[in-house]
């Protein structure tokens, strides 16, 4: 009777794995008037690892005004790459075509300012750009 009770009370002892240190890649997105329309903002963070771009994080926001504050809280070991880049795309809700975008190098711990650049067809873009149709990142 005491043996099962001793086993039950003894149980297993484990220690939690040490927390990996985190860094923040963040800032604000602006540069385009939304003209009282609902928009979708897609941010993708890339790391260059051994000469190849790899998506390491992605965020989507539904917005009715800019600027928008964003942040990616990442474990340090995910930032093994040589450089970080942020691709930002704005499209209207219900319209898949990108209306404005930005592509820039970013750094952890820096308050980045992303300025969207309008496409020539802004605000009435309806067709996807070639890179959007093929799905290449």
UniProtKB/Swiss-Prot annotation:
Organism domain of life: Bacteria
Pfam families named in the record: YscW
Presence of keyword Membrane: yes
A GO CC annotation given for this chain: cell outer membrane
Annotated localization: Cell outer membrane
Entry similarity comment: Belongs to the ExsB/YscW family.
Free-text domain note: Displays a compact beta-sandwich fold with interdependent beta-sheets. Possesses a large patch of basic residues that could play a role in membrane recognition.
Function noted in UniProt: Involved in the synthesis of the type III secretion system (T3SS), also called injectisome, which is used to inject bacterial effector proteins into eukaryotic host cells. Pilot protein that is required for the proper localization of the secretin PscC in the outer membrane. Necessary for full in vivo virulence.
Protein name listed in UniProt: Type 3 secretion system pilotin
Organism: Pseudomonas aeruginosa (strain ATCC 15692 / DSM 22644 / CIP 104116 / JCM 14847 / LMG 12228 / 1C / PRS 101 / PAO1)
Lineage summary: Bacteria, Pseudomonadati, Pseudomonadota, Gammaproteobacteria, Pseudomonadales
The encoding gene: exsB
């Amino acid at each position: 009777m005491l043996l099962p009770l001793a086993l039950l009370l003894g149980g297993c002892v484990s220690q939690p794995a040490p927390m990996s240190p985190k860094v923040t890649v963040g800032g604000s997105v602006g540069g385009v008037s939304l003209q009282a329309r609902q928009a979708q903002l897609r941010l993708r963070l890339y790391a260059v690892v051994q000469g190849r771009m790899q998506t390491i994080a992605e965020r989507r926001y539904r917005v009715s005004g800019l600027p928008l504050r964003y942040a990616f809280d990442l474990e340090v070991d995910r930032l093994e790459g040589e450089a970080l880049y942020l691709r930002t795309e704005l499209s209207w809700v219900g319209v898949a075509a990108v209306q404005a975008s930005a592509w820039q190098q970013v750094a952890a711990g820096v308050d980045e300012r992303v300025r969207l650049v309008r496409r020539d067809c802004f605000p009435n873009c309806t067709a996807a750009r070639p890179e959007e149709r093929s799905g290449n990142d």
